[in-house]
Amino acid sequence: MFQDLKIRVCTDDDLDMLAVLNKQLIEDEMHDNKMNVEQLRERMKGFIHTDYKAYIFEDGSRTIGYALIDHSRKPLYLRQFFICRDVRRKGYGRVALNKLLEFIDADVIDLEVLSWNTGGIGFWRAMGFKDRSIYMRLENKREQDGKAP
């Protein structure tokens, strides 16, 4: 099963698939990103034409997920990691992450996980990640005239 898991670097030919998977990631983690698939495709294109690289995880001929890494940051930054819904909780995430770290030759990598994504937090902690910061946001609610309530 996992011996067939392969990783490859994405190209522009993968953008449509990456956009669909990214949309599923946004939905699954209940992110507030409202971009549609076409907007996500264009954003992903911008990523992979800069210091980011996207990686597809394939088991045989089937795509089972992807990762997006910012290679300009030290340590490297894992911006997105997604395993397809129908193969979750079968060990693919663990194997894909370990193979990815080997593929990119990384000993240290950072990531952020949304505080309400308890499944994600549990996965990352089980993989050995440690809490390092608390990322916070203030959304200042203003009336239409620009004055605070």
Regions of interest found by a model, annotated:
Residues 104-114:
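Conserved GNAT acetyl-CoA-binding A-motif
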Residues 87, 91-99:
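Conserved acetyl-CoA pyrophosphate-binding loop and the N-cap/start of the following alpha-helix
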Residues 5-20:
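A short beta-loop-alpha structural element at the N-terminal edge
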Residues 45-56:
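A short helix-loop-beta-strand connector motif used in the catalytic cores of GNAT acetyltransferases and
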Residues 94, 115-134:
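Conserved active-site alpha-helix within GNAT-family acetyltransferase domains
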Residues 71-79, 88, 107, 132:
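A conserved beta-turn-beta hairpin within the catalytic core of GNAT-like acetyltransferases
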Residues 20-44:
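Conserved GNAT-fold acetyl-CoA-binding loop/helix
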Residues 56, 62-70, 77, 82:
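Conserved beta-strand in the GNAT
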